A protein has these predicted regions:
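Flexible gly/pro-rich beta->alpha loop and the following alpha-helix that scaffold active-site loops
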Residues: 1-50
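Residue-level detector of flexible, active-site-proximal loop/helix-junction positions
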Residues: 2-4, 59, 101, 127
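General beta-strand structural signal in soluble alpha/beta enzymes
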Residues: 21, 53-55, 121-123
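Short, active-site-adjacent cap segments at secondary-structure transitions
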Residues: 27, 59-62, 128-130
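Class I SAM-dependent methyltransferase SAM-binding "motif I" and its flanking Rossmann-like core
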Residues: 31-32, 38-100
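A general structural signal for short secondary-structure boundary/capping elements
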Residues: 65-67, 138-141
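Conserved anion/nucleotide-ligand pocket segment
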Residues: 85-132
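Short acidic-glycine loop/turn motifs at beta-strand connectors
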Residues: 130-136, 140
């Protein structure tokens, strides 16, 4: 559970050059970001030019909504999350872990289910998506 106060989150994010949000359960992560108020602070800092680095769940959290990731994650791990709206830092839906022995089938299920309705960006565990202003590029292995 989140123990950081909104003020301490703001203080830490202000003094650092970048914001790194790691992996784990995407639904639990977003639940805790919202509970602490960190979601709003992160968006504010990024909109003012701070670098955001998201890994796995941290990258999915940057999307407009995280509901699509239920195919590879467990929404029930976040019983208090009633709003699956993501941080909205990007206008696409990131699908990580393509080809991963455990997470790959979930990534493939997302592609199959959502490729015609969502703007998906699919990467494996050795790639990254770089967003600079309006330019989006895939960084190779």
């Amino acid at each position: 559970a989140s123990t950081a106060s909104c003020e301490s989150v703001e203080e830490k994010l202000t003094k650092n050059d970048m914001i790194f949000v790691g992996g784990g359960n995407t639904f639990f992560l977003l639940q805790e970001l919202k509970k602490s108020g960190a979601d709003k602070i992160i968006v504010q800092k990024v909109n003012r030019g701070k670098l955001y680095i998201g890994e796995s769940a941290g990258a999915i959290a940057a999307c407009p909504d995280i509901g699509f990731s239920a195919e590879m994650d467990e929404p029930e791990k976040a019983p208090e999350l009633t709003d699956r709206t993501g941080l909205g830092l990007v206008d696409f839906y990131l699908v990580p872990h393509l080809g991963h022995p455990e997470m790959g089938p979930g990534a493939e299920a997302i592609i199959e289910k959502y490729s015609s309705e969502l703007k998906l960006k699919v990467i494996d565990d050795y790639q990254a998506i770089l967003v600079e202003d309006d330019k989006v590029s895939r960084l190779p292995k």
